[in-house]
Every structure is written in structure tokens, then in C-alpha cells.
Design a protein with these regions (language model features):
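Alpha/beta-hydrolase-fold enzymes
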Residues: 127-131, 135-233
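Active-site nucleophile elbow and catalytic-triad environment of alpha/beta-hydrolase enzymes
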Residues: 228-251
């Protein structure tokens, strides 16, 4: 307890495995009818964050943290926005530094452990709004940021933040990094690496001498990229040090509110340690749900506008 039974059945019949369940929704899924009002806020280090609001006059707010190289326009963000808005809940999707269409001012970017920016967003929301309750959610990397933030805050978390839910989340970052090294995951590594290299090239031009751009074409995998660039920009020794220190598995025991982790067993980007079964069994606050199917940020329901994860997060976060 609390290991939760799941009601997620099967995706469309032609979604043959976790790879199909991951890739096809990212290509095909479109969520229409979502509009944002953008607000830009300053960070304590003189950078900025773009916040995309979708307000319906709700008394509660869902705060969404997106995945690696994502933003508020990703299908998984728009799906949550549309579903929660239908239930008269306002939604705020915040864009990590350099995401959402604008390169940021400072040399640093973002990563799984950069909960300090989520803290900035939460403090801004608490100071500028009067919601009766706030829910935190995160997808993939955004889930790791959310868990890290909750663990770091512990008992100091604002009482207005009532529940949290994340899905497709690398709870154990070293394990997830090891999984990405598998030959079967070359597609994902190349996809992310292409985007990250372009962003690092832009950052290198913005700050000449900050990083060795001559090394960029030689980088072949995440370990090399995170050692050469992520670690150096953000104060870690190397990739291994980054994976360990940015991983939420070291902080989930300090989370002080009911929190759901929804990770599919066939998620191709998660390692075995990303399913904290033993801890969840002994916890009164961490709820773990592990459907057999779902892939990574997939959870497709045939003929449904929304996916299972979105319905499940709504159910968990709004239960009394």
C-alpha cells in the first residue's frame, strides 16, 4: 500500500509494443481548442520563464511541467489543459528555460533536477493569485522536476498545494540513462540529441567560449553530451554525477502530500528502478500505478480525445 490496480486496458490493436505506443501518439495526436495567455516572469538570477495560462475562472489550478525539449504546445500538455479546463480548473503550463520559442538570457539551461525554476513559478503563483487549491503535475522530465521539488520542499510546502501526480517519469535517472543506451532506443537518443545539439550550438554562439562547440559534432550519446555540456553548465562533475544528483529517487521519501506516479511497464525509456515498488508499499503518500501497456507518454484510448493518463490524473488530483 499504496500500489494501485490499474483500469487501463489496451491501446489500439496496431500499437504492437511500447515503441509504437510511444512514437505514434507523438506524431499523430492533435489536441485542438486550447489557447494560452502568456506571462513572462523574472528569475532570481535575472533570467526569465514563459508561463502559458489557460483560465476558465476556476477556483483551483493545475500546474504542469513538460518533458525534455518539450513546451506548452506538446500534445500531452494540451491534453491536460483541455480536460482540466472542461472541469472548470485553470491550468498553467510553464516552459523551461530556452523552451517555448525563446532562448534564455543566462548560460544555464534546464534539466531533471532544476526544481529551482519550478519553485520560482510556484512562488509567483502564490503571490499573484488566490486559488483555493493547487495541484502539481509533470510528464517525463517534468515529472522528475516535480518530484524533486516536492522532496526538497518537504514539510515547508505551501498548504495550498494539495496533491501531485506525474507520469512516464524517470524516478531513477541513472537507470533511465542506462536504458537509453540500449540499441533498441537509438531512435529516441538521436531524436533528443539532435534537438539538444542545436540548442547547445545556439547557447555557444550566445556566450562565446562557454562550451567547446568543436566537440559537439563528435558527441554520440547522452553520456557524452551530459558530461561535456549538461554537467559543465550546471555544476556537476560528469554525466554520472548529474544523473545521481538530479534523480528524484533520493528525495521521494521527503514528499509530504499524496502523490501519484503512473509509469507503464512497457515504457521504453524507463529502467527497472523507475518503479519504486518497495517504497510505495511502505508509504502512506506515494501512490504507484503500473499498467502493463502505455509506452512513454502514450496511454492511448481508442476513439478518445484524451489519454488514460490525463483521465487518471484528473481523478487522482480532484478526489477528496
Amino acid at each position: 500500500m499504496p500500489i494501485l490496480a490499474t483500469s487501463y486496458a489496451n491501446p489500439p490493436f496496431f500499437y504492437l509494443n511500447g515503441h509504437f505506443e510511444t512514437i505514434l501518439p507523438s506524431i499523430w495526436r492533435k489536441v485542438d481548442g486550447v489557447t494560452y495567455e502568456r506571462e513572462q516572469i523574472e528569475t532570481p538570477d535575472s533570467d526569465f520563464l514563459n508561463l502559458d495560462w489557460s483560465k476558465v475562472g476556476g477556483k483551483q489550478l493545475l500546474l504542469v511541467s513538460h518533458g525534455l525539449e518539450g513546451d506548452s504546445q506538446r500534445h500531452y500538455a494540451r491534453g491536460l489543459v483541455k480536460l482540466f479546463n472542461q472541469k472548470e480548473i485553470d491550468v498553467l503550463v510553464w516552459n523551461n528555460r530556452s523552451c517555448g520559442g525563446e532562448i534564455n538570457r543566462q548560460p544555464i539551461l534546464y534539466h531533471h533536477g532544476s526544481a529551482y525554476d519550478l519553485d520560482t513559478v510556484v512562488k509567483h503563483v502564490l503571490s499573484k493569485t488566490s486559488y483555493a487549491g493547487i495541484f502539481l503535475s509533470g510528464i517525463s522530465m517534468g515529472g522528475a522536476q516535480t518530484l524533486n521539488y516536492l522532496g526538497q520542499q518537504g514539510k515547508n510546502l505551501s498548504p495550498l498545494i494539495q496533491r501531485a501526480a506525474v507520469y512516464s517519469t524517470p524516478v531513477h535517472l541513472p537507470s533511465s540513462a542506462a536504458t537509453l543506451r540500449r540499441p533498441t532506443n537509438t531512435f529516441y537518443a538521436r531524436k533528443f540529441m539532435g534537438k539538444l545539439k542545436k540548442k547547445m550550438e545556439a547557447k555557444g554562439k550566445q556566450f562565446p567560449g562557454l562550451v567547446d562547440l568543436d566537440r559537439l559534432p563528435q558527441v554520440r550519446n547522452f553520456d557524452e553530451f551530459d558530461t561535456e555540456f549538461t554537467a559543465k553548465l550546471h555544476g556537476f562533475k560528469d554525466a554520472a554525477d548529474f544523473y545521481e544528483k538530479a534523480s528524484p529517487h533520493t528525495r521521494i521519501q521527503d514528499i509530504g502530500i499524496p502523490t501519484l506516479i503512473l509509469n507503464a511497464k512497457n515504457d521504453p525509456l524507463l529502467g527497472e528502478e523507475c518503479y519504486p515498488v518497495a517504497f510505495a508499499k511502505s508509504s502512506e503518500l506515494l501512490f504507484l500505478e503500473m499498467p502493463e501497456r502505455g509506452g512513454h507518454t502514450g496511454f492511448t484510448i481508442p476513439s478518445s480525445e484524451f489519454n488514460y493518463a490525463e483521465y487518471r490524473l484528473l481523478e487522482f488530483l480532484t478526489q477528496s
